[in-house]
């Protein structure tokens, strides 16, 4: 096992041991679940993810793959959860911590994506659904928003947290894994770190070719590289790259060590893997 894989495995193990698992809740009647979620929101407390947790633990496997066929046949919990997102008031949302707000939006993006897929399933790729990102709208915080609106106008614009790109799942094979639990404010830091470690541990997302000093990265780092500048921008390292690319590489230095770190810091060029848009289905 190479140093990169060993380092990622150790880090991932630490994160897993330090994080709390999701405990499955007994299924309640539809009206009771909706009432519980609405009441929770009206008290200006963190939103209830009970129904969403049930969906993730039941239909998502350890590789982040979704059993869309079964979810489509048993979609009541997902529909309840997505409907409850529209009933959260702006005042309630603004009473939450930043971590709770980020968790809310990431969960919403991922759950709405699940809805978009099962509404049209069977499909081979999310890209086969016309307007899925730009025109298809969902109710959240009392208004209609698109998936692009959630990602680009809220998460990327209002928060300085580039690791959201390790959490947003657009139902494709090359996306980050969909977790088997919801994101939650008090666990968000650990969850995002675990996601990043897992994502970078895959050679299909991050690989160093020492023969020509080239770093190969997921296309996610190409599409959203500017999101790393605010926190990871550097003028001292990676001077052969533009500021955006250097920021991404500087970010990745936090997740490699030893020989791998030396190779990364000596990189001369970057290339990006083709993105596999095939459906992330079981």
Predicted regions and their residues:
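C-terminal motif of bacterial Sec signal peptides marking the signal peptidase cleavage site
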Residues: 17-19
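Residue-level signal for mature regions of secreted extracellular proteins and peptides
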Residues: 13-14
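Bacterial N-terminal signal peptides that target proteins for export
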Residues: 1-9
């Amino acid at each position: 096992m190479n140093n990169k894989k060993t380092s990622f495995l150790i880090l991932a193990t630490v994160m897993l041991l330090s994080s709390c698992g999701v405990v499955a809740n007994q299924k309640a009647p539809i009206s009771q679940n909706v009432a519980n979620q609405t009441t929770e929101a009206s008290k200006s407390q963190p939103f209830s993810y009970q129904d969403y947790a049930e969906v993730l633990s039941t239909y998502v496997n350890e590789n982040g793959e979704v059993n869309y066929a079964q979810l489509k046949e048993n979609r009541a919990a997902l529909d309840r959860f997505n409907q409850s997102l529209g009933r959260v008031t702006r005042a309630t949302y603004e009473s939450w911590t930043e971590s709770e707000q980020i968790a809310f939006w990431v969960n919403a993006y991922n759950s709405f994506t699940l809805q978009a897929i099962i509404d049209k399933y069977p499909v081979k790729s999310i890209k086969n659904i016309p307007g899925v990102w730009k025109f298809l709208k969902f109710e959240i915080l009392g208004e209609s928003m698109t998936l692009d609106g959630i990602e680009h106008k809220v998460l990327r614009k209002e928060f300085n947290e580039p690791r959201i790109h390790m959490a947003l799942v657009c139902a494709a094979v090359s996306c980050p894994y969909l977790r088997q639990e919801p994101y939650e404010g008090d666990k968000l830091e650990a969850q995002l770190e675990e996601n990043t470690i897992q994502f970078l541990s895959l050679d299909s997302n991050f690989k160093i070719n020492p023969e020509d000093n080239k770093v190969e990265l997921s296309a996610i780092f190409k599409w959203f590289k500017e999101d790393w500048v605010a926190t990871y921008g550097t003028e001292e390292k990676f001077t052969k790259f533009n500021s955006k690319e250097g920021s991404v590489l500087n970010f990745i230095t936090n997740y490699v060590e030893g020989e791998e770190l030396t190779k990364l810091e000596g990189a001369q060029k970057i290339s990006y893997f083709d993105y596999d848009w095939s459906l992330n289905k079981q």
